Curated annotation (Swiss-Prot):
It holds the Pfam family Pep_deformylase. Its EC number is 3.5.1.88. It is an enzyme of class 3 (hydrolase). One of its GO terms (molecular function) is peptide deformylase activity. InterPro entries: Peptide_deformylase, Peptide_deformylase_sf. Binds 1 Fe(2+) ion. This is Peptide deformylase 1. It catalyses: N-terminal N-formyl-L-methionyl-[peptide] + H2O = N-terminal L-methionyl-[peptide] + formate. Removes the formyl group from the N-terminal Met of newly synthesized proteins. Requires at least a dipeptide for an efficient rate of reaction. N-terminal L-methionine is a prerequisite for activity but the enzyme has broad specificity at other positions. The active site is at E133. Its cofactor is Fe(2+). Fe cation binds at C90, H132, H136. The gene is def1. Belongs to the polypeptide deformylase family. It comes from Clostridium perfringens (strain 13 / Type A).
Amino acid sequence: MAIRNLRFNDDEILRKKCRVVDDINDRIKVLVEDMIETMYENNGVGLASPQVGILKRIFVVDAMDGAGSRVFINPEILEKSGEQTDEEGCLSLPGRHKPVKRANKIKIKALDVNGNEFVLDAEGFLARAIQHEYDHLEGVLFIDHEL
């Protein structure tokens, strides 16, 4: 495992849409482990692959809810409901914070690091963190959201 260098601010990779992961091979598994280590090293609650310079549909989240790190490969948000507004920040935009309106509840489908499909119902802070990281896969940053 290794800590990866983060991409910051105006790096154009943060604005690009990520590609689907076709094969969860050893390189992808190492990337996931590196992302988890990088997230924790930088005191983050989530990290998406473009933040470490890789345009693949992968993100990791630890919402500090006791579940540990969760891995999402090729995620698809199936449902959104409710509304919440709270302040967000981002490891790629250090020192920047702003209130962002997001769905309060979501249902997301993804693959885990072993290629097993799962569906997760998330709400509150976990739902917010997932939506924030999912946006990164679409080339969207939290500063793009209007209240």
